[in-house]
């Protein structure tokens, strides 16, 4: 279960970081 959660997090992380960077600009 934890492994699947990490895989999902790895997929979502780039998009979350992208949105955060857009808000800063």
Curated annotation (Swiss-Prot):
GO terms for molecular function: toxin activity. Coiled coil: none annotated. GO terms for biological process: defense response to bacterium; killing of cells of another organism. InterPro entries: Antimicrobial_4. The keyword Membrane applies. Expressed by the venom gland. It holds the Pfam family Antimicrobial_4. Keywords: Antibiotic, Antimicrobial, Cytolysis, Hemolysis, Membrane, Secreted, Target cell membrane, Target membrane, Toxin. One of its GO terms (cellular component) is membrane. It is found in: Secreted; Target cell membrane. Belongs to the non-disulfide-bridged peptide (NDBP) superfamily. Medium-length antimicrobial peptide (group 3) family. Ponericin-W subfamily. Membrane-perturbating peptide with multiple activities. It is insecticidal, since it induces reversible paralysis in insects (L.cuprina) after 1 hour, but fails to kill flies. It shows a relatively strong and broad-spectrum antibacterial activity against both Gram-positive and Gram-negative bacteria (MIC<20 uM). It is also anthelmintic, since it potently inhibits the larval development of the major pathogenic nematode of ruminants (H.contortus, IC(50)=2.8 uM). This is M-poneritoxin-Na1b.
